[in-house]
Amino acid sequence: MLLSSMAKHDPNLDRIFQALSDPTRRAMLARIGKGALPVSELARPTGMALPTILRHLSVLEGAQLITTEKQGRTRMCAARPEILAATEGWLAAQRALWEARTDRLEALLQTLTEKDG
């Protein structure tokens, strides 16, 4: 079982979850998800230095959660919702797997209880 799940290892999924592990990046992604924003607008509410913001954006872009594009002197950031949708698919598959396992365990416990009763 472990080997089969390792064979299906997806490094893109690892990058996505690593990017989402930071609350600052999640907040930035939530804001970008409402519409493309310039880097300066993303930096304003955080109080963080621009190099720190750029590192966070680099992680989000590396995970393909956002795209950035230079428009004149402004760098715009836009979300890629299809990447999150793929992540939701993986989570749904995991949820179904674990629900099936707990259903089987519940059925086994019910059978054992009936035998003892």
PLM feature spans:
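N-terminal helix-turn-helix DNA-binding core of bacterial DNA-binding proteins
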Residues: A7, P11-T52, T74-A85, G89
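Residue-level signal for short amphipathic helical patches enriched in basic/charged
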Residues: L20-P23, L60, E82, A93, ...
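Acidic-residue sensor for enzyme active/binding pockets
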Residues: E41, E61, E106
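Amphipathic alpha-helical dimerization/coiled-coil segments
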Residues: M1-N12, A30, A85-G117
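Alpha-helical residues within the helix-turn-helix
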Residues: R44, R55, E61-G62
